[in-house]
């Protein structure tokens, strides 16, 4: 049950969520639960089911990962109060009582829609509770690949050729959309839901029939589709932390087990490999680092993010792919591996992220 500790900072790890990345979130959150320094922090865990129910739980990381946390007898329905006077949670106990719990900081370990897209961040801003990671605007912009690509273009950050189309545009003139995409991008074409992460719903199309099928899959995951020209290059990723200034790590490289870095590659079959630092010349590693900090700053990121790039094999051009404002923290995830390579183990990283969250709130209200 909840303790009355006064000397420890109360930290909520918020996990699960209603997105297609629910399972990944549960595993990522387990890392925070296991690595949080219990001598310094009072841990509170709140799970969000796929149906959107918020439950206070005392589940351990294994129960979170396998999904059994939802059935634990000690779970209690809860809400995060937007009332700044509450500054925390409201629990509904089995005895029918209402219990208020003060919260000092929230770690929203929520990947994808309804968590990484500015929605939960907006709730936390209303509540006046410090939280780890990017703010409302950066979270929303980076979640939408079309908006992020437009921002990259406006900021002069090199990106592969791209187009986007809404469901209405596609359904109104499907052949016209396909013609326009093929004419601008050529083959091959990556087709992506605008608002999805972890490679969910992404297809590489090699011909018109595959393009049509890829569009149908993307529309099953979102109402807007992004089309990007294929890049034959190294897939590299930088971890970025802080703001004013943002600090980026040396990039790591993904050696994908398929034609591209799929959801299964990332989280299931384990055939992909990670190489740190990336297999690139030193000056190219520095160039990627520079672009990572530029992109992070241009899109208003704070706290942490992972910036993903392609480095073309023929030309050496560095092209940004996307920014993930709440990168994975699973045992195979790149962000914590990159930080560990810089000499920052996960417990120290969590301490730093919490400190950054508190610093931001102090600057806003100080």
Predicted feature locations:
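ATP-grasp fold ATP-binding core
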Residues: 152-153, 182-200, 223-232, 236
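Hydrophobic beta-strand scaffold residues
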Residues: 43, 130-131, 159, 189, ...
